[in-house]
Amino acid sequence: MAKNTAIGIDLGTTYSCVGVFQHGKVEIIANDQGNRTTPSYVAFTDTERLIGDAAKNQVALNPQNTVFDAKRLIGRKFGDAVVQSDMKHWPFQVVNDGDKPKVQVNYKGESRSFFPEEISSMVLTKMKEIAEAYLGHPVTNAVITVPAYFNDSQRQATKDAGVIAGLNVLRIINEPTAAAIAYGLDRTGKGERNVLIFDLGGGTFDVSILTIDDGIFEVKATAGDTHLGGEDFDNRLVSHFVEEFKRKHKKDISQNKRAVRRLRTACERAKRTLSSSTQASLEIDSLFEGIDFYTSITRARFEELCSDLFRGTLEPVEKALRDAKMDKAQIHDLVLVGGSTRIPKVQKLLQDFFNGRDLNKSINPDEAVAYGAAVQAAILMGDKSENVQDLLLLDVAPLSLGLETAGGVMTALIKRNSTIPTKQTQTFTTYSDNQPGVLIQVYEGERAMTRDNNLLGRFELSGIPPAPRGVPQIEVTFDIDANGILNVTATDKSTGKANKITITNDKGRLSKEEIERMVQEAERYKAEDEVQRDRVAAKNALESYAFNMKSAVEDEGLKGKLSEADKKKVLDKCQEVISWLDSNTLADKEEFVHKREELERVCSPIISGLYQGAGAPGAGGFGAQAPPKGASGSGPTIEEVD
């Protein structure tokens, strides 16, 4: 496998890690300093550019020109609230370039600005070099991980960073998914297990629920916060000590970037110490205006400073359980990923939430993601080793996918959180007599009406042979592959004519915020949606009944059985209702129900003599404003044909 080795890179907010799968196992590769994780830092000086440990080590001397946290900027707009709030904490300068954030630094005596992708690509280049030094040959193929909540532009920008670093990015995979792969290889026991992965890193927090069964991984739900991690805990400590310095020495150090940076370094060290000891001391010589700052902090005080952040980690856990439709008792394993999960209070909160369940700490939390990425890279390169042979990875669709049926109703074929790859087929029919074609409009979203959802694409299937409404059978298939690319095909069963559209998830898809917003809106508007659904159902039921009555009395087979007077009475009333419908499409449910009862009072006595029952149910279909519905009036979906 020598030359076409593929590596797995965990590109973290604060630290990155690289692994390679060879000789049947994963090696996490140490850098030139002997560290298995490398700071995601890039520094620019008068003479050189430093990446990794070298950059982080000189940060106190050169804070304005040392860039970190590029992952917080990547794929975001300058005006983004997250970018604006983060800028307050950064010692380096972020400038606006056409609503794209750029980092401005002095390098070799001149001012330079870089896009976040460029900074991340420098970190990726460093990780690539670490792997090459270990393997002894060039490496180009890589799998790079991102938080589960990264939106499309953030994923695309991360991929771009890989390309800038000279990597062939085989795939971008979710960090929790990667951790699950690492975990899956460690656990080859049989039987289905539900695993909750709690990933609290330097900058992002992800909760994922996966089902692992005999080498098959299935992501059931993901939740999290793109802005919670170890750095936020450091910020709390920094603020605490800035206040303490003010109290003790009557001086404000917060505007002195170098002093704040030295304090932050000491705080990070103290935080790590507090994971194993109950007290940590800080000793910083000549922190500000020649004043030495010697102080200490207890674990209890640290927990108090961050208590809301720690407690807040349980909300995404609850949300993921809700989305996966699981009770906490159904989770078999709790897996900790990310350096911040070493904090005893975080472990205790999670353990208490799960009623004292043991936590799995068997995987080094800093390395699990890179480990899984390395395994995935080997799979994609076609590694034949038996350890990875039986491993299959399934992701989920973040939003429901469906099409518009008559009346603007959203009919979902693939439900939110369905496992991908997946394929769903449903049969639809026409809405009007001799309809020559149907327009297939593909939407994503959770709302009842398509106008509240996101249109992904549309196409037409024409050339349907003339036939009464409800007769043609049009089979629509939604097929999503492993990369999230959607193919929608429509086939007319009688002629075999087909048409299709391919929707890739490249550009302009919904961001995490929009997805969350749509789901929240869907919950908020559920009541409105119900009213609308009922209204459309009542309207469809009325229209269907009117058309059925009309066609029933016009049936040739009834000649002689039905007096002309009765026939005229029914037809006139039906025509009156149909005309009323045309001019009152926005009436409310009660009016439609009332009209239907009025029509039934005229028709039922006449028809019951001829038929037992009240006419055949109408067929549904695609169409203009109004879909017909079976006489049942049970809901807004179109009639499905078996």
From Swiss-Prot:
Described purpose of this protein according to its UniProt entry: Molecular chaperone implicated in a wide variety of cellular processes, including protection of the proteome from stress, folding and transport of newly synthesized polypeptides, activation of proteolysis of misfolded proteins and the formation and dissociation of protein complexes. Plays a pivotal role in the protein quality control system, ensuring the correct folding of proteins, the re-folding of misfolded proteins and controlling the targeting of proteins for subsequent degradation. This is achieved through cycles of ATP binding, ATP hydrolysis and ADP release, mediated by co-chaperones.
GO molecular function, one term: ATP-dependent protein folding chaperone
Biological process, per Gene Ontology: binding of sperm to zona pellucida; negative regulation of apoptotic process; positive regulation of microtubule nucleation; protein folding; protein refolding; regulation of mitotic spindle assembly; response to heat
Entry keyword set: Acetylation, ATP-binding, Chaperone, Cytoplasm, Cytoskeleton, Methylation, Nucleotide-binding, Phosphoprotein, Stress response
Family stated for the protein in its record: Belongs to the heat shock protein 70 family.
One CC-aspect GO term: mitochondrial matrix
Lineage: Eukaryota, Metazoa, Chordata, Craniata, Vertebrata
Entry-linked Gene3D superfamilies: 1.20.1270.10, 3.30.30.30, 3.30.420.40, Actin, Chain A, domain 4 (3.90.640.10), Substrate Binding Domain Of DNAk, Chain A, domain 1 (2.60.34.10)
UniProt keyword annotation of Iron present: no
N6-acetyllysine: modified positions: K77, K108, K246, K348
Name used for this protein in its record: Heat shock 70 kDa protein 1B
Binding site for ATP: 12-15, 71, 202-204, 268-275, 339-342
Cross-referenced CDD domains: ASKHA_NBD_HSP70_HSPA1
N-acetylalanine modified-residue sites: A2
PROSITE patterns found in the cross-reference section: HSP70_1 (PS00297), HSP70_2 (PS00329), HSP70_3 (PS01036)
Major subcellular site: cytoplasm
Region of interest: Nucleotide-binding domain (NBD): 2-386
Subcellular localization, as worded in the UniProt entry: Cytoplasm; Cytoplasm, Cytoskeleton, Microtubule organizing center, Centrosome
Subunit-structure text: May be an auxiliary component of the CatSper complex. Identified in a IGF2BP1-dependent mRNP granule complex containing untranslated mRNAs. Interacts with CHCHD3, DNAJC7, IRAK1BP1, PPP5C and TSC2. Interacts with TERT; the interaction occurs in the absence of the RNA component, TERC, and dissociates once the TERT complex has formed. Interacts with TRIM5 (via B30.2/SPRY domain). Interacts with METTL21A. Interacts with PRKN. Interacts with FOXP3. Interacts with NOD2; the interaction enhances NOD2 stability. Interacts with DNAJC9 (via J domain).
Modification type Phosphoserine: residues: S632, S634
TM region(s), chain numbering: none
